[in-house]
Amino acid sequence: MGNNIKVTFDPNKLAAWWPTVGTYYTPTTTVTNPAIFKPGIYQTTSLKNPKNQQELDAILMTRYKEIDWDNWQGFPVNQRLPVSNNNPPSGQRAETFEIKSRPIIVPGIRDIPRGIVPPQTPSNRDQRRKPTPLTPPLRDTHPHLTMKNQTGHLQGFAEGLRALTTSDHHNSAYGDPFTTLSPVVPTVSTTLSPPLTIGDPVLSTEMSPSGLLGLLAGLQVVYFLWTKILTIAQSLDWWWTSLSFPGGIPECTGQNLQFQTCKHLPTSCPPTCNGFRWMYLRRFIIYLLVLLLFLTFLLVLLDWKGLLPVCPMMPATETTVNCRQCTISAQDTFTTPYCCCLKPTAGNCTCWPIPSSWALGSYLWEWALARFSWLSLLVPLLQWLGGISLTVWLLLIWMIWFWGPVLMSILPPFIPIFALFFLIWAYI
């Protein structure tokens, strides 16, 4: 007795799969009114009957390779196979197989039935024998996975296999007098794996030349900016130190007597000098001031663009509407014009618009006027300075002319920062 191999199938479409299963022994005599196979357990006595799962795989693979895929037109789904009632040929021992489905991995195909065998006339064998143990799990790797130039034909093969699947369940089955296994429930798995594309390029984990050049360029930019930052800090440190020495910066007087160092300025103390910690303390303060200056510039830029919706403390104009109509607030939207609303107990809302530009500056100015009333005296002066722009420009030119030589030794390191600020101001 061979191993039990179970399969489930649609009886109405059984013949569609039959031509690709393998060569089985089929008697020449059939019944007058041929009937289609029904799910169950049958006998077969083919010369190529598989004795185990490996032999069945070999039969399926042989049949798969015998098919002329170039001229294959699909399965004859309207074909019906007759039920055979003849006895086995002489010298051949009848083998009983319980037909069972197992997945066979084909590119684009999954969960297809392994094979079908024609029924034979039952013999008087023992009814109470124990069932044959199940076969071990089948490996998912098959030789036909390495076949080439079959992608187009396998698509038609998958379409033919889809004709075998059905969502209906048939409960009728033929019994087997030689085994105690239950009849097979006719359910077919319709799950098809996605097509496997053959010849796709393998993704390489190595960096491409363009990516390597981009990385090197990025490192160069970072190194350039870091050197400029150090140069700016050194220039500001020199300017800060020069404020304490109007006649010129002398040599460093904080040299350590234990570790003699060469003569140097206080702005370039080596680590062995006592002035080294004071030099880096000054530069740390300089870095904080530069960061504060940058954040202030960014805040002014955002306020000028109107991206900081702040409700004014003393609105120039206001309206009173029903609270149900007052639904827009500074926290709910970022599109101009803005609307600030208050909800009094009477059920009406007092609303006023937020300035489309300099909203934060207006709020800070109003806050300062509320606490320092003398600042209101500066309003006419500021308006006057704004009205005489020519005078202001002349004053600025005179200041640059007077402090020009000193500024020219300080400003060159700041030129990249000024260019960056200009680009941010122009494009934001």
From Swiss-Prot:
Q: Which organism is it from?
A: Ground squirrel hepatitis virus (strain 27) (GSHV)
**Gene Ontology annotations for the cellular component aspect, listed alphabetically:** membrane; virion membrane
Residue segments, region Pre-S1: 2-145
Chain residues carrying a lipid of type N-myristoyl glycine? G2
Task: Return the domain comment text from this UniProt entry.
Answer: The large envelope protein is synthesized with the pre-S region at the cytosolic side of the endoplasmic reticulum and, hence will be within the virion after budding. Therefore the pre-S region is not N-glycosylated. Later a post-translational translocation of N-terminal pre-S and TM1 domains occur in about 50% of proteins at the virion surface. These molecules change their topology by an unknown mechanism, resulting in exposure of pre-S region at virion surface.
Sorted alphabetically, the keyword list is: Acetylation, Caveolin-mediated endocytosis of virus by host, Fusion of virus membrane with host endosomal membrane, Fusion of virus membrane with host membrane, Glycoprotein, Host-virus interaction, Lipoprotein, Membrane, Myristate, Transmembrane, Transmembrane helix, Viral attachment to host cell, Viral penetration into host cytoplasm, Virion, Virus endocytosis by host, Virus entry into host cell
Protein name per UniProt: Large envelope protein
The segment annotated Pre-S2 runs over: 146-204
Say what the protein does: The large envelope protein exists in two topological conformations, one which is termed 'external' or Le-HBsAg and the other 'internal' or Li-HBsAg. In its external conformation the protein attaches the virus to cell receptors and thereby initiating infection. This interaction determines the species specificity and liver tropism. This attachment induces virion internalization predominantly through caveolin-mediated endocytosis. The large envelope protein also assures fusion between virion membrane and endosomal membrane.
Report TM segments.
212-232, 284-304, 377-397, 404-426
Q: Which residues are glycosylated?
A: N348
Q: Which compartments does it reside in?
A: Virion membrane
**What does the UniProt PTM comment say about this protein?**
Isoform M is N-terminally acetylated by host at a ratio of 90%, and N-glycosylated by host at the pre-S2 region.
Q: What is one Gene Ontology biological process annotated in the Swiss-Prot or TrEMBL record?
A: caveolin-mediated endocytosis of virus by host cell
Q: Which family does it belong to?
A: Belongs to the orthohepadnavirus major surface antigen family.
Where are the stretches annotated Pre-S? 2-204
Q: What is its main location?
A: virion
Q: Which residues lie on this side of the membrane: Virion surface?
A: 2-211, 305-376, 427-428
**Which InterPro entries does the entry mention?**
HBV_HBSAG
User: Which loops or segments lie on the Intravirion side of the membrane, by the record?
Assistant: 2-283, 233-283, 398-403
**Chain residue ranges for the region called Disordered:** 110-144
